[in-house]
Amino acid sequence: MAGRGKAIGAGAAKKATSRSSKAGLQFPVGRIARFLKAGKYAERVGAGAPVYLAAVLEYLAAEVLELAGNAARDNKKTRIVPRHIQLAVRNDEELTKLLGGATIASGGVMPNIHQHLLPKKAGSSKASHADDDDN
């Protein structure tokens, strides 16, 4: 008869591994699962839903941080500030669509000069007339 006790030669109990580490994620799967359950989005929450949501959130965070890091490097800075996040999000078409209604605190505005306010390009026509005078 097979007993239910400890197996012969079994050492200490197996160390617990988090669902985040099982999925290879940095974002907390357990915490997201708790928020999904407490938020009453549905009566029941499947086992894969918090893992998938954590993966999506981690990907979005990595994408924004990479673009913000590039913006910081372009401005010769080593620290990402809200301005760099604003520039990163607004310069990316898909992130702008996703976060279009969001306001980033201390992000500033995108630099933009309307075309009618820019000076006319008269230099090109003068250069062509100067070439005619030389001949």
UniProtKB/Swiss-Prot annotation:
UniProt cross-references to Pfam families, sorted A to Z: Histone, Histone_H2A_C
InterPro entries, per database record: Histone-fold, Histone_H2A, Histone_H2A/H2B/H3, Histone_H2A_C, Histone_H2A_CS
GO MF term set: DNA binding; protein heterodimerization activity; structural constituent of chromatin
Keywords linked to the UniProt accession: Chromosome, DNA-binding, Nucleosome core, Nucleus
Family: Belongs to the histone H2A family.
General function of this protein: Core component of nucleosome. Nucleosomes wrap and compact DNA into chromatin, limiting DNA accessibility to the cellular machineries which require DNA as a template. Histones thereby play a central role in transcription regulation, DNA repair, DNA replication and chromosomal stability. DNA accessibility is regulated via a complex set of post-translational modifications of histones, also called histone code, and nucleosome remodeling.
Subunit structure: The nucleosome is a histone octamer containing two molecules each of H2A, H2B, H3 and H4 assembled in one H3-H4 heterotetramer and two H2A-H2B heterodimers. The octamer wraps approximately 147 bp of DNA.
Entry-linked PANTHER family: HISTONE H2A
Name recorded for this polypeptide: Probable histone H2A.7
Origin species: Oryza sativa subsp. japonica
